[in-house]
Design a protein with these regions (language model features):
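Sequence-specific dsDNA recognition surfaces
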Residues: 14-32, 46-76
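Specificity-determining recognition surfaces
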Residues: 126-154
Length: 158
């Protein structure tokens, strides 16, 4: 909080971003539909760390499968936030990421900026340093419901 002194305003995540959930329907990839090399990188929680993306282990889905899935496909400058298991890991899909086709799994959401002039680097810093424990539900498998995620307030210098 010392970062801003007294001059700060708060905005809810819902006001700043469209929150996009992955497709959890009947077309959700089964284990035998995941490949070590294919058309679309299907992110799992090992790929989204507290330091951003990690591609040590990768799973891909075919172009056909990718087309069957409706929501949950990344666009450049999206932010990915993990919402199940390890909650609050954040990765930024900028031009440094070489993969052109990526999808989130059911344990994460896409935060897509509603305005192009958001300072992404700053937002990512704030998201990474947020204390999600207040809004997490469930003890065996912690999760951050979208209804609660929408209400989280982020500080901005004013």
């Amino acid at each position: 909080n010392e970062m801003f002194g007294e001059n700060k305003i708060f905005e809810s995540i819902d006001n700043l971003f469209d929150i996009i959930d992955g497709d959890r329907g009947k077309n959700y990839p089964k284990s035998d539909e995941l490949f070590s090399e294919e058309y679309c990188l299907f992110l799992n929680t090992k790929n989204v760390t507290k330091n951003g993306f990690s591609f040590d282990t990768k799973q891909f889905i075919t172009k056909t499968k990718d087309k069957l899935l409706r929501k949950g496909k990344l666009e450049r400058y999206d932010i990915v936030l993990t919402t199940r298991g390890t909650v609050g890991n954040v990765a930024y899909y900028d031009e440094l990421i070489k993969y052109k086709h990526l999808r989130i799994n059911s344990g994460m959401v896409i935060l897509r900026p509603k305005t192009p002039n958001l300072n992404q680097k700053f937002i990512i810093h704030v998201l990474r340093n947020n204390n999600y424990s207040r809004v997490i539900s469930g003890s065996a498998q912690p999760q951050l419901p979208i209804t609660k995620l929408k209400k989280i307030l982020l500080p901005f210098p004013h």
